[in-house]
């Protein structure tokens, strides 16, 4: 029976060096979700989309809708790729279901 000491074999004893590598976590790329102006989608529908899918209050949604109307494009929000992709898909599906040609796109920030 052995006690907690060694087994008499001194091989393998020595100084070990443990190195720690710092991994830099890269922040995910961000994407802007944009709504594009068209001549057919009602302004109220755009406001509804902004409230429903981007959690904008009525005032912010109206401000963005007017920016889209006057400048041709407006930013709905900035998200990671997966979230932005989902938002674009949800908006496009909702617009099609309601027979509106509204376009929603994403671009890398």
UniProtKB/Swiss-Prot annotation:
Compositional bias annotation for Gly residues = 1-11
Which BP terms does GO give this entry?
A: protein catabolic process; proteolysis
Instruction: Specify the domain of life of the species encoding this protein.
Output: Bacteria
Segment forming the signal sequence: none
Chain spans, region Disordered: 1-24
Q: Which residues form a coiled coil?
A: none
Which InterPro entries does this one have?
Answer: ClpS, ClpS_core, Ribosomal_bL12_C/ClpS-like
HAMAP family noted in UniProt: ClpS
Q: What does this protein do?
A: Involved in the modulation of the specificity of the ClpAP-mediated ATP-dependent protein degradation.
Under the subunit heading, UniProt states:
Binds to the N-terminal domain of the chaperone ClpA.
What family does the database annotate? Belongs to the ClpS family.
What is the name of this protein?
ATP-dependent Clp protease adapter protein ClpS 1
UniProt source species: Mesorhizobium japonicum (strain LMG 29417 / CECT 9101 / MAFF 303099) (Mesorhizobium loti (strain MAFF 303099))
């Amino acid at each position: 029976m052995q006690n907690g000491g060694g087994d008499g074999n001194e091989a393998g004893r020595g100084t070990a060096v443990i190195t720690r590598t710092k991994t830099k976590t890269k922040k995910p790329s961000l994407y802007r979700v944009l709504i594009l102006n068209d001549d057919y989608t009602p302004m109220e529908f755009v406001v509804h989309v902004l409230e429903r899918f981007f959690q904008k209050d009525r005032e912010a949604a109206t401000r963005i809708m007017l920016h889209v109307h006057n400048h041709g494009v407006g930013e709905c929000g900035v998200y990671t790729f997966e979230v932005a992709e989902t938002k674009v898909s949800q908006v496009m599906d909702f617009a099609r279901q309601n027979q509106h040609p509204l376009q929603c796109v994403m671009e890398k920030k």
